[in-house]
Amino acid sequence: HDAKLQQLREAETNNGYGESAGYDAVRNRAQKHRDELQQLVSELNDSGKKICGYGASTKGNVLLQYCGFTRNDIPVIAEVNQDKFGCFTPHTLIPIASEDEVLAMKPDYLLVLPWHFRDNILVREQNYLNNGGSFLFPLPAIDVVTGEHQRQAAWSHHVNRSGCATGSIWVS
């Protein structure tokens, strides 16, 4: 165990985590990513697009709170768990409704809060995509997946080494 602990300590030191600068860099990347997601959601809302949430997950609630999103930004979150219907997200107080109810609202974008289930969601929700809907995946990089041809639009022309996307929307 001592050898593994020593390896871990060396890796932390080599990556700058022995000093506050290493943590400052992580904080700065997280804040930049948050700012870019806030900007994208704001621009989409300002252009008249309807954005709803998809999946009332714990990870998603952390993201909603960190970004400061409210029901003004995301009016409702689609969920499959009936126990959550009629409830609200912690702190941000965004209402949670059934997926069927939210999809009937014909949102232009669904902000995916359990983004780690990306592949399963894209397979499961082909009908939504084929009918013109788009998924907005906030992490690990901001990514928009749109309909018919499963074109992917990214929030940037590239994702930098830290995993943060920068720039504007483009379609490939």
Roles of regions detected by a PLM:
Residues 1, 33, 61, 91, ...:
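Histidine (H) residue identity feature
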Residues 40-122, 131:
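A solvent-exposed beta-alpha-beta segment
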Residues 5, 114, 166-168:
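Intrinsically disordered, low-complexity regions
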Residues 18-46:
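Flexible, polar/low-complexity N-terminal or interdomain linker segments that lie immediately upstream
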Residues 1-29:
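Flexible, glycine-/basic-rich loop-and-beta segments that form/coincide
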Residues 118-124, 130-172:
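Non-catalytic N-terminal targeting/anchoring module and adjacent flexible stem/linker
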Residues 34, 82, 151-153:
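Intrinsically disordered, low-complexity segments enriched in glycine/proline and serine/threonine
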